[in-house]
Amino acid sequence: MKKSTLLFSLMAMALSGCNSVLNAPIEVKKLVYQIEHTDPAWQQHLKQLAEIKNYEVKGQFGYISPTERFSAHFDWQYKTPIDFTLALSSNLSTKLLKLQRSHQGLTVSDSEGYSRTEADIHALMQEIIGVSFPIDQFAYWVKGQPAQEGNYIVNEKRQLSQFSYPINQQIWQARYVEYHENRVPYLPKLIVLENGQQTLKIRLDHWNY
């Protein structure tokens, strides 16, 4: 299946009746002050996030590029670095696209019977969305858990505010626009990822762990 066909599969699930995530804000609130990475409360928060190993989160995913714009519901189920599933679907269609990680690599399949497995998961992601997106890192990003030695900023609430991540000579900028603050630890509610040409908006509505 060519990249254009994979993108068409995603676009076929566009939520014409529910485009709120595409119109969601992309800027984080202005920092009151920035927290050092060694701050004890921040380190305690990181420890709490690390303890969330097996989880599920549901929400809405929006993709914007110069030539494509679509959104879909998602269901992300994570168990281990080699056992996770991302399912994309729409209320307006029976179409389903699923990405599943296993020992064999990454499998992409749809509700029409197509299935393909690649050991090179980054190459497959390149075909799907046009960039070698690090889906293996996504498991940590959705929790607001940065790489230990990463380039990131922590806000005054001891929440991850933003970070940058290099991929194939491109820099992805991540901004954590909103958090669920009715539970501990605080978990992200709206994340925006941009690389200058593509924007991914991820609204995380329901957490279960």
From Swiss-Prot:
It is a lipid-anchor. One of its GO terms (biological process) is protein transport. Monomer. It is found in: Cell outer membrane. CDD domains: LolB. This is Outer-membrane lipoprotein LolB. Belongs to the LolB family. GO terms for cellular component: cell outer membrane. A lipid is attached at residue 18 (S-diacylglycerol cysteine). Residues 1-17 form the signal peptide. Keywords: Cell outer membrane, Chaperone, Lipoprotein, Membrane, Palmitate, Protein transport, Signal, Transport. It holds the Pfam family LolB. The lineage of its organism: Bacteria, Pseudomonadati, Pseudomonadota, Gammaproteobacteria, Pasteurellales. Plays a critical role in the incorporation of lipoproteins in the outer membrane after they are released by the LolA protein. A lipid is attached at residue 18 (N-palmitoyl cysteine). SUPFAM superfamilies: Prokaryotic lipoproteins and lipoprotein localization factors. InterPro entries: LolA/LolB/LppX, OM_lipoprot_LolB. HAMAP family: LolB (MF_00233).
